[in-house]
Curated annotation (Swiss-Prot):
The active site is at H63, D107, S201. Its main location: secreted. Gene3D superfamilies: Trypsin-like serine proteases. This is Mast cell protease 3. It comes from the Eukaryota. SUPFAM superfamilies: Trypsin-like serine proteases (SSF50494). Residues 18-19 form a propeptide. Residues 1-17 form the signal peptide. Disulfide bonds join C48-C64, C141-C207, C172-C186. Its EC number is 3.4.21.-. It comes from Ovis aries.
């Protein structure tokens, strides 16, 4: 069964350490671009990840679309009210116009914030790839998030991270019937059981300091590899959309 990697918002108690599958706790604020999203779908609360790409825009997965979206920047322990945190509401959620919730195609969304985030040591932007830049099989990347620690396990209260290897496209083509190599990336580490899991949706796949992918979907048993939206295939849409709303909703 394929599932999106979002999660009902049931955070573990503060002080309870955990991991993304096969990962470890990140150094506090070592990923200052990370965003924690809370939103509602049909009255239920969910969480996703995201990342800051402009002072007033967060990039995430389109399947993280819901109502009353709140963005927390500058967090490490998400259950604490840390001084570094900036909580900002979303003015406008802009999923890709060709997003397909049945095949998971074009799973990308921009969130315009109601005000610009203040740039600090704990809050900053991450670079996006160049147009049509491709990651290659064998390349080491990483993901981070506050998602579920494993099958039937709680979500993390502290930011977790894990190193992943970009896999050959054939692995995801065989594993997922709707995998699209042109707009998606296959990543994980089947031999070591490392990957993103529930609640990590929308977070970045980071390769050499550049956000190359967005956590999209995988199998519900926590096995790897998983599918990531290929950001380089959507650069023109990202740039065009942010230009369109450049002077709207920024403090």
């Amino acid at each position: 069964m394929v599932l999106f990697l979002l999660l009902v918002a049931l955070l573990s108690p503060a002080g309870e350490a955990g991991k993304i599958i096969g990962g470890h706790e990140a150094k506090p604020h070592s990923r200052p671009y990370m965003a924690f999203l809370q939103f509602k779908i049909s009255g239920k609360s969910y969480i996703c990840g995201g990342f800051l790409v402009r002072e007033d825009f967060v990039l995430t997965a389109a399947h993280c679309l819901g109502s009353s979206i709140n963005v927390t920047l500058g967090a490490h322990t998400i259950t604490d009210q840390e001084r570094t945190q900036q909580v900002i509401q979303v003015r406008r959620a802009i999923p890709h116009p060709d997003y397909n919730d049945e095949t998971c195609a074009n799973d990308i969304m921009l969130l315009q914030l109601t005000r610009k985030a203040e740039m600090t040591d704990a809050v900053s932007l991450i670079n996006l790839p160049r147009s049509l830049e491709k990651v290659k099989p064998g390349m080491m990347c990483s993901v981070a998030g506050w998602g579920q620690l494993g099958v039937n396990m709680p979500s993390a209260d502290k930011l977790q991270e894990v190193d992943l290897e970009v896999q050959r496209e054939e692995k995801c083509i065989a594993r997922f019937k709707d995998y699209i190599p042109v707009t998606q990336i296959c990543a994980g580490d089947p031999s070591k059981r490392k990957d993103s899991f529930l609640g990590d949706s929308g977070g970045p796949l980071v390769c050499d300091g550049v956000a190359q992918g967005i956590v999209s979907y995988g199998k519900d048993d926590g096995t790897t590899p998983n599918v990531y939206t290929r950001i380089s295939s959507f650069l023109s849409w990202i740039q065009r959309t942010m230009r369109q709303y450049k002077n709207q909703g920024s403090a």
